[in-house]
Regions:
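Active-site ExK catalytic segment of metal-dependent nucleases
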Residues: 205-214
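Domain-level recognition of nuclease-like catalytic cores that cleave nucleotide substrates
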Residues: 241-254
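Accessory nucleic acid-recognition modules appended to NTPase machines
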Residues: 16, 21, 25-200
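Active-site-adjacent loop/helix micro-motif of nuclease/hydrolase catalytic cores
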Residues: 214-224
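Short, hydrophobic beta-strand segments that form beta-sheet elements in well-ordered domains
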Residues: 234-240
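Arginine/glycine-rich "motif VI" loop of SF2 helicases in the C-terminal RecA-like domain
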Residues: 225-232
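Short conserved micro-motifs at the rims of enzyme active sites and ligand-binding pockets
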Residues: 145-149, 220-221, 248-250
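Amphipathic alpha-helical segments of the small helical/lid subdomains adjacent to P-loop NTPase cores
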Residues: 1-20
Length: 254
């Protein structure tokens, strides 16, 4: 019922603030003190930044820069990594920073999402490493970096705050935690879909969209994707804030 839904929603909102790091959770449960929780997030964030001791100084600096760019990149429209911003040099590509990206993803500090323009099962056969998104490994770290101690950014319905990046990060973390390799759809003519995952049961690809606004049934890129007969994909999932579960034209809204 609505009462139970509101309770679960409030707890989910606090999860967005606290995240899943054991120390952050324990500090929150001890006295509900968000100042202590945010300090824990800062400590973990700083530890991640300096925890590249196996590399020489040049690699360390690039790893830190890439990691520091993650929140601001996610706030951009395309959300993908802009390689020229890492060192302020034009003409740079993914291959110039492959070692740094590998460190961040293999260590679990960041989640890599590779582009797919022509989806086929299994997705790994058609991924493009040149267009990569990175998400932080914990949503609490992200909201700490974005909003600091202002919990109202998440707890209140503030029109000036777009929580799309936060919700996408949660979905990325959950998909990764359940063993899915992360991809997204990027096509100049058809648009972009937030996530693509392999559906091993149906030997097909499952597209996933994450919506934070009231217009969650409007998704032109997803429609274009599903209407492309060459792909042979006729089902998708859209996550939203609405307390409604229904299916329409192959799209399941949750």
């Amino acid at each position: 019922d609505e009462s139970a839904h509101n309770i679960l929603l409030k707890r989910f909102q606090y999860y967005l603030l606290v995240g899943g790091m054991p120390e952050a959770i324990n500090n929150y449960l001890a006295d509900r003190n968000m100042t202590r929780v945010r300090q824990t997030h800062k400590d973990i964030h700083n530890l991640y930044r300096i925890d590249a001791s196996q590399y020489d100084e040049d690699h360390k600096l690039k790893i830190r820069k890439i990691y520091d760019l993650v929140p601001s990149n996610l706030e951009n429209k395309k959300k993908r990594m802009v390689y020229k911003n890492i060192e302020g040099k034009k003409g740079k590509t993914f291959s110039d920073y492959a070692d740094e990206f590998e460190y961040l993803t293999n260590s679990g500090v960041a989640l890599e999402v590779s582009a797919i323009s022509n989806p086929r099962f299994p997705l790994v056969e058609s991924e493009q490493k040149r267009l990569v998104k990175l998400y932080l490994n914990d949503v609490g770290l992200l909201t700490s970096l974005l909003y600091g101690l202002n919990v109202n950014a998440v707890l209140q319905d503030i029109k000036s705050v777009n929580l799309g990046t936060v919700y996408e990060s949660v979905v990325a973390q959950e998909l990764a935690a359940h063993g899915f390799k992360l991809h997204y759809y990027d096509n100049k003519k058809k648009g972009e879909v937030d996530f693509l995952v392999d559906d091993h049961g149906k030997l097909n690809v499952l597209p996933i969209e994450v919506k934070s606004g009231k217009d969650y049934t409007q998704h032109s890129a997803l429609n274009n994707f599903l209407e492309t007969s060459d792909y042979g994909i006729n089902r998708a999932i859209v996550f939203s804030n609405e307390r409604k579960v229904f299916e329409k034209r192959g799209v399941t809204y949750l």
